[in-house]
A protein has these predicted regions:
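A small/polar (G/S/T-enriched), proline-flanked helix-loop surface module common
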Residues: 13-162
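Sec-dependent N-terminal signal peptides
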Residues: 1-2
Length: 162
């Protein structure tokens, strides 16, 4: 195992050692986060609002520069994520995400609208990558893997799942 880690580090592709195992109060595998972040050692999550039962917003930064914006809402009215993405100018090349019924992946952006608890309200997870869309479009699969892994844990932390 140590030989593999040294080999990967020597290639310059292993950023996971600098990435916390929690982002925005949510446990996440660092290997899923690493491809979404620029090179750098000083990875921090900075809450932009206190985590509450209905709203959480934070920024993941590397070297003091914002890299990811993660926003969660619970208790929201449901809406069609793909229709929303097609109407919003922030979504470039939106398409349905795999593995989540009402979710969209776009160049540098992910949004999912899923049931929150047993009520009729919804949880919304909105993730934005802070990079040019020309770079972000090459990371769609990685963003989707990260987001679909973050989603169920984030829903528990915000109170949608027990």
């Amino acid at each position: 195992m140590a030989v593999l880690a040294v080999g990967v580090s020597a290639c310059g592709n292993d950023k996971s050692n600098a990435i916390p195992e929690q982002l925005c109060g949510v446990a996440i595998t660092p290997e899923l986060t690493a491809p979404l972040l620029p090179d750098g050692d000083d990875v921090k999550t900075e809450p932009q609002s206190p985590r509450k039962d209905e709203y959480a917003q934070c920024t993941v930064s590397v070297g003091g520069k914002a890299a990811l914006y993660i926003v969660e809402y619970s208790g929201q009215n449901s809406f069609d994520a793909l229709e929303h993405a097609r109407d919003a100018s922030a979504f470039r090349n939106p398409q349905k995400a795999k593995g989540v019924t009402n979710a969209v992946i776009a160049d540098g952006k992910f949004i999912a609208v899923t049931p929150c608890g047993e009520g009729k309200k919804s949880h919304v997870l909105d993730i934005d990558m802070n990079m040019p869309s020309s770079e972000a479009m090459d990371l769609r699969d990685e963003l989707e893997r990260f987001a679909t892994s973050y989603l169920p844990v984030g829903k528990k932390v915000i109170g949608c799942e027990k």
